[in-house]
Amino acid sequence: MQVNNLGFIASILFVLVPTVFLLILFIQTGKQSES
């Protein structure tokens, strides 16, 4: 099965963007609760 390059990149971005967004929120809330 040949994977479309653009579709492959889109799939990675589709997973990566929300993950990074959640990580940033998690780190910010963690720092706030510490102080």
Curated annotation (Swiss-Prot):
Superkingdom of the source species: Bacteria
SUPFAM superfamilies, per database record: Photosystem II reaction center protein M, PsbM
UniProt subcellular location: Cellular thylakoid membrane
Record's keyword terms, sorted: Formylation, Membrane, Photosynthesis, Photosystem II, Reaction center, Thylakoid, Transmembrane, Transmembrane helix
Membrane association type: Single-pass membrane protein
Modification sites for N-formylmethionine: M1
Annotated GO biological process: photosynthesis, light reaction
Listed transmembrane segments: 7-28
Any single GO CC term annotated in Swiss-Prot or TrEMBL for this entry: plasma membrane-derived thylakoid membrane
Disulfide topology: none
Record note on disruption phenotype: Decreased photoautotrophic growth. Decreased assembly of PSII monomers and dimers, increased levels of the CP43-less intermediate. A double psbM-psbT mutants only assembles PSII monomers, not PSII dimers. A double psbM-psb27 mutant is incapable of photoautotrophic growth, but does assemble the CP43-less assembly intermediate. Cells are light sensitive and rapidly photoinactivated; recovery requires protein synthesis and can occur in the dark.
Subunit structure, as described in the record: PSII is composed of 1 copy each of membrane proteins PsbA, PsbB, PsbC, PsbD, PsbE, PsbF, PsbH, PsbI, PsbJ, PsbK, PsbL, PsbM, PsbT, PsbX, PsbY, PsbZ, Psb30/Ycf12, peripheral proteins PsbO, CyanoQ (PsbQ), PsbU, PsbV and a large number of cofactors. It forms dimeric complexes.
Role of this protein: One of the components of the core complex of photosystem II (PSII). PSII is a light-driven water:plastoquinone oxidoreductase that uses light energy to abstract electrons from H(2)O, generating O(2) and a proton gradient subsequently used for ATP formation. It consists of a core antenna complex that captures photons, and an electron transfer chain that converts photonic excitation into a charge separation. This subunit is found at the monomer-monomer interface. Involved in assembly of monomeric PSII from the CP43-less intermediate.
Protein family according to the UniProt entry: Belongs to the PsbM family.
Name used for this protein in its record: Photosystem II reaction center protein M
Annotated organism of origin: Synechocystis sp. (strain ATCC 27184 / PCC 6803 / Kazusa)
Lineage: Bacteria, Bacillati, Cyanobacteriota, Cyanophyceae, Synechococcales
Gene field: psbM
